[in-house]
């Protein structure tokens, strides 16, 4: 039986459960349940703290897991990504008191508070910077005001929370994170087919969230230009219409770009442009 770790709480929990449900797997009915057996798919799900999931998967006790890329990197567990899931996006950056221009090199000899000490130490080592890293499990932003640290390294969203504590982010992101499906690095043939099947199912759901099907009628004389705009995955589907000067075109397009793509098609003479949702896709 395939053994899969799922976040039991936090921002990753509900989207992960929703994707697995859409992929055809059994969903837990009580948030207190720590395990759910899905006999129809021969899978057992374990609901664990997101920060612990990579450790369980890396040890080989579980076959697959859903966690954050930053959490997997921080764990230092021997895991690898099978699939990026498209939710839970965040950046991990340094921040320090506002009022001056900061650079990572300015951290030399200073105290840095963070909930991700391994990520920070690796980054500092790569830059040749020596600093004191202080591990805190939460409310990292307040550490500077309390005199515990000179700077922090933390997950940054809009920057509003940093601003409330008179902090400003600086330098490049240490980690661009999102939810990922992971497996043990060097995982062998045991349960390989089952791992591949779950990955394919989940990938189909993620793809359906990120792409739309675009149909439109196109004058033949601008078909080459139109297919440059909508190349599809492999190639667009092109079918003749009753009017020989026109063809019907169908192609998958990124959801985030659909309006600009429709604008381009309309500008070159395409008509009846229709975007449709897709629920699943297999490659």
UniProtKB/Swiss-Prot annotation:
Record InterPro entries: ATP-PRT_HisG_long (IPR020621), ATP_PRibTrfase_cat (IPR013820), ATP_PRibTrfase_CS (IPR018198), ATP_PRibTrfase_HisG (IPR001348), HisG_C (IPR013115), N-reg_PII-like_a/b (IPR011322), N-reg_PII/ATP_PRibTrfase_C (IPR015867)
Cofactor requirement: Mg(2+)
Annotated Gene3D superfamilies: 3.30.70.120, Periplasmic binding protein-like II
Family as reported in the entry's similarity comment: Belongs to the ATP phosphoribosyltransferase family. Long subfamily.
Name of the protein in question: ATP phosphoribosyltransferase
GO biological process terms on file: L-histidine biosynthetic process
UniProt keyword Cytoplasm, yes or no: yes
PROSITE patterns, per database record: ATP_P_PHORIBOSYLTR
Name of the gene this protein is made from: hisG
């Amino acid at each position: 039986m395939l053994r899969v770790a799922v976040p039991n709480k936090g921002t990753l929990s509900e989207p992960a459960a929703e994707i697995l449900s859409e992929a055809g797997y059994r969903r837990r009915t009580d948030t207190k349940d720590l395990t759910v057996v899905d006999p129809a798919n021969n899978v057992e799900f374990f609901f664990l703290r997101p920060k612990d999931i990579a450790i369980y998967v890396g040890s080989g006790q579980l076959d697959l897991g859903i966690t954050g890329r930053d959490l997997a990197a921080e764990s230092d567990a021997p895991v690898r990504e099978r699939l990026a899931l498209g939710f839970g996006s965040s950046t991990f950056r340094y921040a320090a008191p506002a009022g001056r221009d900061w650079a990572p090199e300015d951290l030399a000899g200073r105290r840095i508070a963070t909930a991700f000490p391994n990520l920070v130490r690796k980054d500092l080592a790569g830059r040749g910077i020596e600093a004191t890293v202080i591990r805190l499990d939460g409310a990292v932003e307040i550490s500077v005001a309390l005199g515990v640290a000179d700077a922090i390294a933390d997950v940054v969203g809009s920057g509003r929370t940093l601003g409330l504590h008179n902090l400003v982010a600086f330098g490049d992101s240490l980690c661009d994170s999102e939810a990922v499906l992971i497996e043990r690095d060097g995982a062998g043939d045991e349960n390989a087919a089952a791992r591949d099947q779950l990955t394919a199912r989940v990938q189909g759901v993620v793809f359906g969230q990120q792409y739309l099907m675009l149909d439109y009628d196109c004058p033949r004389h601008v078909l080459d230009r139109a297919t440059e705009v909508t190349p599809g995955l492999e190639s667009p589907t092109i079918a003749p219409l009753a009017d020989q000067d026109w063809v019907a075109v169908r192609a998958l397009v990124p959801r985030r770009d659909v309006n600009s793509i429709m604008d381009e098609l309309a500008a070159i003479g395409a008509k009846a442009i229709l975007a449709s949702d897709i629920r699943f896709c297999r490659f």
